[in-house]
Amino acid sequence: MINYLFTITTWLIIISYWFIIIIVTCRILSKRRAISSSAAWLLVIYIIPFIGICTWFLLEEPYLGTRKLKLIKSVWSKKNKHFNNLKSHNYIFENNNSEVARSLFKLCKYRQGISGIKFNKLKLLKNTKDVIKNLVRDIYLAKNTIEIVFYIWKPGGLADNVAIALIQSAKRGIKCRLMLDSAGSLEFFRSKWVDMMQQSGIQIVEALKINLLHFFFRRMDLRQHRKFILIDNYITYIGSMNLVDPYLFKKSLGIGQWIDLMTRIEGPISTTMGAIYSCDWEVETGQQISPKRVKNNLIIPTYPIKECTSIVQVIASGPGFTEDMIHQALLTAIYSAQQKLTMTTPYLVPSDDLLRAICTAAQRGVEVILIIPKSHDSLLVKWASRVFFSELLESGVKIYQFKKGLLHSKSVLVDKQLSLIGTVNLDMRSLWLNFEITLVIDDKNFGKSLAIIHNEYISHSSLLDPKLWKIRSYWKKIIEKLFYFLSPLL
């Protein structure tokens, strides 16, 4: 009898095991994902079934939640009213783009429903101290609203200057809203600043809040990765910088300070940023804070028109927003390059399509430069990035490894004319998962400024020698091959 029960139990376990394997396999194959990503998941599931299946359900199957995804789509679609209102001020729109930017701006127009916007004054800020100094000044000068979203806010050092300025502005009647990612800003939410800010009247939202219940129903690595500040619906700061002191942040890793890049904008493009912020805020709180109807005095610039040479688009990406938009934008920008393409990213784990586009650009005579950090804060990303070096080098891509800290800026410059700056890394997480934001800028003067910064990065970098790369140690090649299978999962 015991043997019979044992046999039945064994067969039930075996049948259940293969049933689950088959179900998960069918689910993986039914999703519209890159072949490399599907193959990587299947490999993990068949080699280490229990761990592989559990990891799949935790990282892939629970996405954002059907209910919340529908909410985002619904709220974002309502913002079309704001864009329609903006269209009544037709003199701020510009459809006559430069040749290299034309395809990308057409893509943005037809997929997002709005043309490029002119009359914007842009300034690149490459030093965190300068960013904080300018930001604190603008916060003190705010007249109506201050709206902030960051992935990481780490108290201490320069970050506290912003906190103090916010509190003082709130006390004088400025409406202040602060939205921070729950995981990235965990230290902030455990600090004294939360109570101090709330007591002064600042509204604080913990975005994509982490708790035990969500662990089973939503991806924990899906994060609010946007980083921008909107003041009076007219001034915007946007870029790669988290609200941290670069001299203190992750100091124990011994990789030096973080090097970021931000853009300060004055002009009507900020009204688009306001629509994006109000969407994120409403999704998290249920509170509608849609930007007020745009008036002429908010559109007409207060600075000389001759300074407004930039045509700007904004791409908001993430679950519920325009599907695959940032991936398509990057591909379009790369394929538009005719002379020179420079890209900076801290994390290089591109999709197959992006890798092919970058290599093809180099093979058709475009000078392609990739600037990445030599030291990483993530061992996984470090090895995963190296997987792609051989193919890039063989195609003629120049890879520079930045040595003076962790280069965290995310930028693309095409033919010194078309620029992309924002929060998107060249990795799967930024391209397909996180909530991100990117500026698209058609402006030769801005391109020149960005090129100068890129050259400064290069001056503090070492050029990877293709010959030396080929003769690297055998054990390194083995580790890289192992990470090749895991790279689509990162």
Swiss-Prot record:
Reaction(s) catalysed by this chain's protein: 2 a 1,2-diacyl-sn-glycero-3-phospho-(1'-sn-glycerol) = a cardiolipin + glycerol
Species for this entry: Buchnera aphidicola subsp. Baizongia pistaciae (strain Bp)
Keyword vocabulary terms for this entry: Cell membrane, Lipid biosynthesis, Lipid metabolism, Membrane, Phospholipid biosynthesis, Phospholipid metabolism, Repeat, Transferase, Transmembrane, Transmembrane helix
One Gene Ontology term from the biological process aspect of the record: cardiolipin biosynthetic process
GO cellular component: plasma membrane
Name by which UniProt lists this protein: Cardiolipin synthase A
EC number annotated for this UniProt entry: 2.7.8.-
GO molecular function, one term: cardiolipin synthase activity
Described function: Catalyzes the reversible phosphatidyl group transfer from one phosphatidylglycerol molecule to another to form cardiolipin (CL) (diphosphatidylglycerol) and glycerol.
Predominant localisation class: membrane
Similarity comment: Belongs to the phospholipase D family. Cardiolipin synthase subfamily. ClsA sub-subfamily.
